[in-house]
């Protein structure tokens, strides 16, 4: 393809009309649910039996799926969207059709509703951290 200009001659701050559709996104907090899901897994993995972002179900800017096995042994597939987290299925990588489960704003709230063992593990971790802070403050 021949061009009648040298791209290096274009000014650095050239604004193209095609970019106008992206101006509305400037300054907004656009989330990538895949990254958000990974952060959730890393945050609470200590308090569940197993947890990982699904490699089978779609992971996109607006949705991600997390497989979790609580300490009691029950498995769930969780859906993460802007609305929050909800149980989407009762097996890894499985979405139950017609399931209308409640959305939770945080993974802590969701796991607290599903797993007494999570509640205990989270409480113990919190207590250990507070004791460590107390020891550090007395030193």
From Swiss-Prot:
Q: Kindly indicate whether the keyword Cytoplasm belongs to this entry.
A: yes
Give the record's keywords alphabetically: Cytoplasm
Q: Which InterPro entries does the annotation name? A: GSKIP, GSKIP_dom, GSKIP_dom_sf
Coiled-coil boundaries: none
Does the record carry rRNA-binding as a key word? no
- Main location class: cytoplasm
As for subcellular location, the record says: Cytoplasm
Which residue ranges traverse the bilayer? none
Q: Which GO terms describe its cellular component?
A: cytoplasm
Which SUPFAM superfamilies has this protein been placed in?
Hypothetical protein c14orf129, hspc210
Name of one Pfam family that matches: GSKIP_dom
Q: Name one GO biological process term.
A: regulation of canonical Wnt signaling pathway
Of which family is this protein a member?
Answer: Belongs to the GSKIP family.
From the Swiss-Prot or TrEMBL record, give the protein name: GSK3-beta interaction protein
Lineage, top ranks: Eukaryota, Metazoa, Chordata, Craniata, Vertebrata
